[in-house]
Amino acid sequence: MNKKELIGKIHSSMYHQLQVRGYAAPVDVLIDTGILPKQKYEDWRFGRVRYLEAVCNANLKRLSFVLHQMRVYAQAHELKPSFCYYKCWGVRKKNGTGHKPVIPLQFSKSGSPEIERSYATHFVDLARVQELKAAQPQTEE
């Protein structure tokens, strides 16, 4: 897939995510573009893979390009960046008491804070979020 096709897929993925839930996430764009298989994403979320880049079907240059195009789309559409803390799924309590230990997930091999932040930043359409909230049926208490 050439860069032009990839840009189209990235922007389309972001548009659809924003319409459905009001925000777009890099991992979902990677899944939508075919760079990250859903099963590999789940393996990473459950802690079976050390870092996300290891299971992506693209080199680091292409991954960087995807993240850059997401930022370009976000700036053009005035989306608000929002950091999201990714933690491991399925962590069980040892004896059923106390809090579950929180295990942070790593996106890149290097673990560089800038790279990690760029993967963990979701882009929010505040106006669309308000529309979606208004469209939800109100529950009475």
Report the location of each language-model feature:
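Phospho-regulated, low-complexity intrinsically disordered regions of nuclear gene-regulatory
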Residues: 60-141
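Positively charged, polyanion-binding regions of nucleic-acid-associated proteins
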Residues: 3-27, 32, 36-37, 42-55
